[in-house]
Amino acid sequence: MVEINCFRLMSTDTTVTNETDNFPLVDDESQGSSIDTGGRIPRPAQPLPRDESDDQEEKARLISQVLELQNTLDDLSQRVDSVKEESLKLRSENQVLGQYIQNLMASSAVFQPAQSKAPQTK
């Protein structure tokens, strides 16, 4: 019984292969087109029409996303401005502290260049 089923399946496959050999290919110029268009030029495929509600929902979603991104950009811009101001303030304070340290070092005897002292004779 199993052998008969396999034989039937094999014979069906060879028949299908033989039938597909008879179909004209696009590149075959010798055979004419077997598709009857009724004298009309077929139109290219068009996308399926979408529901108006789907379009409105998509538009509303995109608008809310754009507004959210604009708000985020606004927040980031304000943050950049405040960080710039903080940076300028810290840079100015660093300059003041640097000058203060230089003044302290100049007035302290510890940081003065060592002067060679001649031995005192009595």
UniProtKB/Swiss-Prot annotation:
Residue segments, region Disordered: 17-58
Coiled-coil ranges (or none): 53-95
Stored InterPro entries: SCOC
Gene Ontology CC entries for this record: cytosol; Golgi membrane; trans-Golgi network
Compartments where found: Golgi apparatus membrane; Golgi apparatus, trans-Golgi network; Cytoplasm, Cytosol
Keywords of the record: Coiled coil, Cytoplasm, Golgi apparatus, Membrane
Membrane topology: Peripheral membrane protein
Main location: Golgi
Matching PANTHER family: GEO08385P1, SHORT COILED COIL PROTEIN
Function: Positive regulator of amino acid starvation-induced autophagy.
Family of the protein in this entry: Belongs to the SCOC family.
Protein name: Short coiled-coil protein homolog
Organism per entry: Brugia malayi
